[in-house]
Every structure is written in C-alpha cells, then in structure tokens.
Amino acid sequence: MYTLEKRVYRPPLEANSALLEVSLGCSYGKCTFCRYANGETPLQLLPAEILGDNLAEMADEDIRGNRMYLLGGNVLAFKAKYLIDVFQYVQSYLPQITQFSMYGRADDVLHKTDSQLESLRQAGLHMVYIGVESGNREILKNSRKGETPDEIVTALHKLDKMQIHYGLSSILGLGGQEMWRRHALDTADLYNRVRPDSIRVMTLTAMPGTPLERNVQNGRFKPASPHTILQEEALLLQNIRYAAHDCWFAGTHVSNSIPLEGSLLTDKQKMLVILKKAIKAESDQSLQQSDLKEW
C-alpha cells in the first residue's frame, strides 16, 4: 500500500479499525510544538488513483469490523461534500465499513454548518479526535494554537448537538516548569465542561526544527522536569470529575514515563495510586542524586 506518511499516527482506540490514508499535513501548521510548524508539509490530498489502488488492495484482504480511521492531518478540514464522497468511495470497495473517524481541529467543526455536520453524520462520520492541548488561554496563545478554550468548548458542544462522538487529547508539560499547575487545573476544567468518549495525554517533546525546540534552546521556554510532569498528570486526573459520564483515559503514549489507562468512572483511583507511587519514586531518586553530589 502506498502512503505519503511513513509513520502511522492513530489514537489507541482505533487499534482495531481499518486504516486509510487520505491526506498529509495540516491546514493550520503553526503550533509551536508540531512537526508541521516548519511549513514544509502543506495540507495535501492523496491522489485519487492512489486512493483507489489502496482500496482495491484492502478489498482483497480480510478486513473485519465496520470502522475505518482516515489517516492524515486534520482531515475534517476538507469540505463536507468531499468527505462524504470519500466515505462513499470507501464503501464501494468495502461495504462493511459504516463508521468513519478522523482527526480535526476545533475550528474545523466551527467552520461547518449544522446541516453539513448532520450530512456527515448520516454518511458515517462517527468519531472526531481533537487535540485541545490545554485549557489555559495563555498557554494556548504561547503555543500558537490559534484557538481559545471557549472556542474549543463551543465546537465540542456543537458535536454533542449533532450526536457526533469525539475523543480529546492534551499535552503534559505544555505550560513548562512555571505554569504546570495552572495548565493541569484549567485543562481539567475544560474536560469537565464537555463529554468526550476518551481523553489521551502525551508528554511534550521538543521535536527538531520546531519553534518549541528553538524556544527551549534560547531559554524562552523552560521544560517541566520529569517529576513535575508526573505531578501535573496526577493533578489533572484528580480534577477530572465525571459523575455519570464514562470516559476512557489513556496515558499510554510512548512519550509518557508511566503508561496507564482505564475508565474514569471505575479506574481513576487505581491510576492515581500508580502516579503517586511514581512521584514518590522520582522524589526519592532526586534526593539520592542530591546526596551523591553533596558527598
């Protein structure tokens, strides 16, 4: 199968979904932490003939299940009519696929009318994954996210209204060493205002060539320590409060030092115990290193 992207980026909950790349890059491409921020990968579609060849290849395989995740940057940025055409094109090869999921930005939702979203849902749009990154307005501004917490919440309420499911993600350490507490509390507050199917957290990584890497190198951004990252994750998890709405919390990204996941209704305390043990272990290790230096 031919792809433009050599690595597969998909949410954990899509592990059993069929995968089809339809685009590469991001329509926004300005977030300081993002690999697309260098402007070298503009949003582009996979050529139609390649899409058809890949689908024909998939049709010859034993594709089970009814879900497909459309690989690419913010796929939801494309016009509703184009996305519906893609859904129908997929189903002409794989009629068993009835649910589609993809990544999108909050402003991709806001730029579509209720009628367009309803048409997408009826055509098979089931799940949209959105990176909220932080619930703190200042942190989002510093990261050049191009969206505010209120705009993100408005977009998610719009998806609720249209009965389209969504999964969210945020970045541990995005507030740096100085704003970790505010970052955790405000992000938890944002999560408490909406009803996601899943929440995924990953740890900030200053990837080569990004504005974030330059900010770290010139001292404008002080990364949070591993100990602080664990404290931040625990504070975030502690303050996400869903009384009846179940949500899957996934902290299994390769960037995280402590992998954990579970239901926020039934497994939250277990996950907090794991984090608190890790925080204590990190503190003990720091103390030992300090003692060695003094000795």
Go through the PLM ranges and name each one.
Residues 26, 34, 51, 70, ...:
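Conserved, mostly hydrophobic/aromatic
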Residues 51, 83, 113, 152, ...:
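Aromatic/hydrophobic pocket-lining residues that form the small-molecule binding cavity
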Residues 4-53:
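Canonical Radical SAM [4Fe-4S] cluster-binding loop centered on the CxxxCxxC motif
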Residues 115-117, 175-193:
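Catalytic cores of alpha/beta
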Residues 59-161, 165:
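Conserved SAM/AdoMet-binding glycine-rich loop
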Residues 2-14, 192-295:
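Auxiliary Fe-S-binding modules of radical SAM enzymes
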Residues 34, 107, 131, 135-139, ...:
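Conserved strand-turn element in the central/C-terminal portion of the radical SAM core barrel
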